[in-house]
Amino acid sequence: VISHCRVNYRPLVAADKPGLVLDIAALSENDLAFYCLDVTRAGHNGVLAALLLRALFNGLLQEQLAHQNQRLPELGALLKQVNHLLRQANLPGQFPLLVGYYHRELKNLILVSEGLNATLNTGEHQVQISNGVPLGTLGNAYLNQLSQRCDAWQCQIWGTGGRLRLMLSAE
């Protein structure tokens, strides 16, 4: 249970071939953020990018939320910042990434894909999310963003590094 939401995930690949890194963190008692990174497309730099994301992502997101009047984050601005930091860290490569933010009280899910495929199922709707261009490919981040109101959802995410299913229901 994270931020009063029941969260489950299931890797849908062999355990000896890890490739998708999933990180989920509570930002407050009402909201959480997550990302899924495919570490297989950039050699050893994929693992380094995962460590860099782990160290920076939640802090950048919390800083952004603290400095804006609106309740929902600007994931596009955040991903541009992450793309810039990957370049500053001199980490060449492609970093397919899906980023998500969920606010329990607003029942609002935001998903942004930069190179990973995803299908979102809310029970009422099933939406295919365009995979877009992986981070690190271009000098800027180009976004495929989806915003959906829901109190429960499943997201199947896949790329070169494998496939996983992430499920959430608000309590």
Specify the residue positions occupied by each region the protein language model found:
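Short acidic/polar inter-strand loop motif in beta-rich domains
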Residues: 159-167
